[in-house]
């Protein structure tokens, strides 16, 4: 599982990112850049992280009409990011357009970024989904439906809860990528996410990638916390 641990850089700006990455001199990480950081710093933060040798999951969760998403993905691919995402709720035409944009915008001689779709946010409970979003399926059924739609639209995988991974393996096969946020060490507060799991549990359930934020970024010693998460995730001593 080389570089399948993604560290969420949930910081307000570049200064905080630099302070955090100071703990990881010489380490090549797979990092997630979300809306807050990207909207503050723009493409320059991607250039900075790439120059440091890090892989990047640009987590913007695009959801718009197909042509707009295609154009946006063309631009994002030109930044040489490694992974991007959309909302599966945008539909098949939008997701197919996303792939077209990535293919058109990728740097010469390189593969297009991995493209995944969000099924349901990890902050979404089944009760919330039914009452507020108006989906009458069970949470598992809704996620499986979106995952199959994602695969049929030509995307590489989905963002999902670890608890949903086994079902998605049945529906979409073992090659389908599952990226699972909501990962916490057993001693951590779960904060605002409802469907959470430990790194060990994510490994047991078959996640392809895990995304870890506060357990590492808020730790007194981020490097040691990273090693602890990595050990639990990979099942080996590092």
Curated annotation (Swiss-Prot):
Gene Ontology annotations of biological process type: 'de novo' pyrimidine nucleobase biosynthetic process; 'de novo' UMP biosynthetic process
Catalytic activity: orotidine 5'-phosphate + H(+) = UMP + CO2
A GO-annotated cellular component: cytosol
Transmembrane segments: none
Subunit structure: Homodimer.
Source species, domain of life: Bacteria
Protein name: Orotidine 5'-phosphate decarboxylase
Enzyme Commission number(s) of this protein: 4.1.1.23
Gene giving rise to this polypeptide: pyrF
Organism the protein comes from: Bacillus cereus (strain G9842)
Active-site residues, record numbering mapped to chain: 61 (proton donor)
Its job: Catalyzes the decarboxylation of orotidine 5'-monophosphate (OMP) to uridine 5'-monophosphate (UMP).
């Amino acid at each position: 599982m080389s570089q399948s641990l993604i560290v969420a850089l949930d910081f307000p700006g570049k200064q905080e990112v630099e302070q955090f990455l100071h703990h990881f001199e010489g380490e090549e990480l797979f990092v997630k850049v979300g809306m807050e950081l990207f909207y503050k710093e723009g493409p320059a933060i991607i250039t900075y992280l790439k120059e440091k040798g890090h892989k990047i999951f640009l987590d913007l969760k695009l959801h718009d009409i197909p042509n707009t998403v295609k154009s946006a993905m063309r631009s994002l691919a030109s930044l040489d990011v490694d992974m991007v995402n959309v909302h599966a709720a945008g539909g098949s035409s939008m997701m197919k357009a996303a792939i077209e944009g990535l293919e058109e915008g990728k740097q010469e001689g390189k593969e297009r970024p991995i493209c995944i779709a969000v099924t349901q946010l990890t902050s979404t409970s089944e009760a919330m989904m039914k009452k507020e979003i108006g989906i009458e399926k069970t949470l598992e059924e809704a996620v499986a439906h979106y995952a199959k739609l994602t695969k049929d639209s030509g995307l590489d995988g989905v963002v999902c809860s670890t608890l949903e991974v086994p079902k998605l393996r049945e529906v979409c096969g073992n090659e389908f990528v599952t990226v699972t946020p909501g990962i916490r060490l057993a001693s951590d507060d779960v904060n605002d996410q409802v469907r959470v799991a430990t790194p060990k549990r994510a490994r047991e359930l078959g996640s392809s990638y895990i995304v870890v934020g506060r357990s590492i970024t808020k730790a007194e010693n981020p490097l040691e916390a990273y090693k602890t998460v990595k050990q639990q995730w990979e099942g080996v001593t590092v």
